[in-house]
């Protein structure tokens, strides 16, 4: 009778649990206590189930504590409840106190650790489980693989894959999807994930979504599109997460193959239409993804239309719009959206303010950037970094350093980004003392061997011509340096005219086989080849460029063109230039300059006219290049016509360099009076360089009278310059007026004016050396 009564009570408790009738359950609880049935573990487990289902933790705890005998079910039930409510501390306490555990116990503990963000601890618990002789279930592996995904531990994930194969769980859709997600996030979707997908008998929307996301992360554009197409053909339901993943491949990203440009914004628009057709028009996450795609593809008009039609927006939506307009140099729109955001009741977060700051500085609106920064109550280090980066990128280096000092007064500790920005500013200003102070700060911190910091320090000392210090810093950290530091050191050698050392260091880097040269490495070392006029080395590096896949990089293309031009291989330069698919203004300028440098002025002018007819807009450097070519080839009238067209047709105001070219052109042609008139009529008549050019022409044509007049003007403009004395002395010497030349040398000594020694390069076989001559 007693046993039958217990079964009846247990049945009632199950019914009350299913219906969540806690009050009725408490009545039964009271009856059990009065009848002395608390020792019945089975009944107590039913009470525990009731209170857990009703979410009454206090009574569940009371029942659990008062149980005289607890079995594995009791422990698991209470552990499951503590895990469900997220009470990690008590869950660990219950788990550690369990006299015996089963797979459910381990699964609960691993699951709660993963959910609460303790993935590493979850993996440790899993290892303990295996050591205790328990075989993982599908729930175990799913949780452990989720932990591997979050900590990006693909190696441990592969071990779990092996366990799944041995236990036959790899074909289970639950485990299979977890494997796909892990491989996708760890970057192994192509190597291993696709095989897992193919082994699943009936992949579902989660399977397809994971594979598409992984392929998108690895920039496998075509494969991702094909997988999405297969998903649609199989009739698998497409959800908003899948659409977000496929959308991500239509955004331009570094390292993405050319197919991303083919699909690009067009694919984004197609997915947008599909999302509307499938009824996801109100999905906030998907709409934010769409906004981001339009913004990244520089279609802010389209993004603004989507934003206006969104039924719901959040801070992320506003931030995407603000960043997008900033990338397009439209700070006015960024500020407008910030104002609208506040008016709509949204509180801008730090990301918002930093985004607006970036937009303002990117657009050159420094004053608005200052106001936005001043409106931040307590700027964080990230906000200061955005401000300092803005000043530095806009070439306001002094203000960057000044604001850095203000930041220090706020008792904020600069991070590696802060110090990198300030080191860059010090390098640009050649502010050695400031660089040394930052160096001291770096030595006292744990970031002394951070690659960005090391690169910045090398740049500072190189710009300040302290190459011995740069080399010490480089050698001290050589085993921990990345490509940026090597590039900085190579660039330092090039900047200090140590081009041979630049070539040697590049070879050393290439021979290590640890780091591969990038486009910056090649552009820098090719520049050194240009200055050394070393065609042999230049061709070797050209071969490496092709082998490394950087031949279509715009900087490398320009450097190669320049190298061939400087080495006198003008036809090779033109052949390479013609093969360039996307010519920008810089490479046009380089080729025009190359023709001029090699005395082929007619071809330089012809290429200039071809540039104009192609629709490429010339800049100031274009005109310097073509006017120089006119000067060296005696194309006086053509040069004057091109100078006249600068302002009249192209809207470019001639600067000093342009007038120098024309004065030189007129002077070379013997039209010295015209050259003098032009020099007097320019806004730069107080520039000594302009008159030095004219004085040099006087020597060539033997015009002593004009030479004296110009030399006197030069001496007034720059009394300590040796140019006037040397050029006038050379004029006297060319006309055999030795007494006048000697008198001028005496005057030069009397006034303590010294001539700067020249430098020349000497080639010994394949090696290069430099020497000085006076």
Swiss-Prot record:
The keyword Cell membrane does not apply. Belongs to the PPR family. PCMP-E subfamily. One of its GO terms (molecular function) is RNA binding. InterPro entries: E_motif (IPR046848), Pentatricopeptide_rpt (IPR002885), PPR_At4g14850-like_plant (IPR046960), TPR-like_helical_dom_sf (IPR011990). The lineage of its organism: Eukaryota, Viridiplantae, Streptophyta, Embryophyta, Tracheophyta. NCBIfam families: PPR. GO terms for biological process: RNA modification. This is Pentatricopeptide repeat-containing protein At4g20770. PROSITE patterns: PPR. It holds the Pfam family PPR. PPR repeats lie at residues 5-39, 40-70, 71-101, 102-136, 137-171, 172-203, 204-238, 239-270, 283-313, 314-348, 349-379, 380-414, 415-449, 450-480, 482-516, 518-552, 553-583, 584-618, 619-654, 655-685. It comes from Arabidopsis thaliana.
């Amino acid at each position: 009778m007693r046993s039958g009564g217990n079964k009846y009570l247990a049945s009632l408790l199950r019914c009350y649990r299913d219906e969540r009738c806690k009050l009725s359950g408490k009545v039964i609880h009271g009856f059990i206590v009065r009848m002395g049935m608390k020792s019945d573990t089975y009944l107590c487990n039913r009470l525990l189930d009731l209170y857990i289902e009703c979410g009454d933790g206090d009574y569940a705890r009371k029942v659990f504590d008062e149980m005289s005998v607890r079995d594995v079910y009791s422990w698991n039930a209470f552990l499951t409840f503590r895990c469900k409510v997220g009470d990690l501390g008590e869950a660990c306490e219950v788990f550690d106190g369990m006299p015996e555990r089963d797979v459910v116990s381990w699964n609960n503990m691993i699951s709660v650790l993963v959910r609460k963000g303790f993935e590493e601890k979850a993996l440790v618990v899993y290892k303990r489980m295996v050591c205790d002789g328990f075989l993982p279930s599908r729930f175990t592996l799913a949780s452990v693989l989720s932990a591997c995904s979050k900590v990006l531990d693909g190696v441990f994930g592969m071990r779990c894959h092996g366990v799944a194969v041995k236990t036959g769980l790899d074909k289970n859709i639950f485990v299979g999807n977890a494997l796909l997600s892990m491989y996708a996030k760890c970057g192994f979707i192509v190597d291993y994930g696709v095989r897992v997908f193919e082994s699943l008998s009936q992949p579902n929307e989660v399977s397809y979504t994971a594979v598409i996301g992984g392929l998108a992360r690895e920039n496998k554009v075509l494969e991702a599109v094909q997988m999405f197409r297969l998903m649609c053909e199989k009739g698998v339901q497409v959800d908003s997460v899948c659409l977000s993943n496929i959308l991500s491949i239509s955004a331009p990203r570094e390292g993405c193959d050319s197919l991303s440009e083919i699909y690009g914004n067009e694919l984004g628009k197609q997915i947008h239409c599909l999302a509307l057709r499938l009824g996801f028009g109100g999905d906030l996450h998907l709409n934010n993804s769409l906004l981001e795609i339009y913004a990244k593809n520089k279609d802010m008009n389209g993004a603004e239309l989507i934003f206006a039609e969104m039924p719901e927006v959040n801070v992320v939506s506003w931030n995407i719009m603000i960043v997008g307009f900033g990338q397009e140099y439209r700070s006015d729109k960024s500020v407008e959206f910030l104002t609208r955001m506040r008016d709509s009741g949204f509180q801008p977060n730090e990301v918002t303010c930093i985004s607006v700051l970036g937009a303002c500085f990117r657009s050159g609106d420094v004053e608005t950037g200052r106001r936005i920064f001043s409106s931040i109550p307590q700027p964080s280090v990230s906000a200061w970094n955005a401000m300092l980066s803005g000043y530095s990128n806009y070439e306001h280096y002094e203000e960057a350093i000044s604001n850095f000092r203000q930041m220090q007064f706020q008792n904020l500790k600069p991070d590696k980004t802060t110090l990198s920005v300030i080191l860059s500013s010090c390098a640009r200003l050649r502010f050695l003392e400031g660089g040394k102070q930052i160096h001291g700060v770096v030595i006292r911190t744990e970031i002394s061997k951070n690659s960005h910091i090391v690169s910045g320090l090398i740049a500072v000392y190189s710009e300040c011509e302290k190459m011995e210090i740069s080399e010490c810093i480089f050698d001290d950290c050589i085993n921990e340096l990345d490509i940026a530091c090597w590039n900085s050191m190579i660039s330092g050698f090039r900047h200090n005219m140590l081009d041979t050392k630049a070539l040697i260091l590049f070879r050393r880097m290439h021979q290590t086989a640890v780091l591969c040269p990038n486009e910056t490495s090649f552009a820098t070392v090719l520049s050194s080849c240009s200055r050394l006029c070393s065609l042999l080395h230049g061709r070797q590096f050209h071969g490496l460029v092709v082998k490394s896949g950087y031949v279509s990089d715009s900087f490398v293309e320009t450097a190669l063109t320049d190298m061939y031009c400087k080495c006198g291989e003008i036809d090779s330069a033109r052949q390479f230039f013609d093969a360039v698919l996307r010519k920008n203004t810089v490479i046009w300028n380089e080729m025009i300059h190359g023709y001029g440098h090699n005395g082929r002025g007619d071809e330089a002018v012809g290429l200039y006219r071809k540039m104009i007819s192609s629709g490429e807009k010339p800049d100031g450097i274009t005109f310097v290049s073509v006017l120089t070519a006119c000067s060296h080839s005696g194309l006086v009238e053509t040069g004057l016509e091109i100078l006249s067209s600068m302002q009249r047709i192209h809207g470019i105001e001639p600067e000093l360099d342009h007038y120098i070219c024309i004065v030189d052109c007129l002077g070379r042609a013997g039209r010295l009076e015209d050259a003098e008139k032009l020099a007097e009529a320019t806004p730069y008549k107080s520039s000594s360089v302009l008159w030095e050019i004219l004085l040099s022409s006087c020597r060539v044509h033997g015009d002593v009278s004009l030479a004296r007049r110009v030399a006197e003007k030069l001496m007034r403009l720059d009394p300590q310059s040796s140019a006037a004395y040397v050029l006038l002395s050379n004029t006297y010497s060319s006309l055999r007026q030795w007494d006048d030349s000697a008198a001028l040398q005496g005057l030069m000594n009397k006034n303590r004016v010294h001539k700067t020694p020249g430098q020349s390069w000497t080639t010994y076989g394949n090696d290069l050396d430099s020497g000085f001559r006076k």
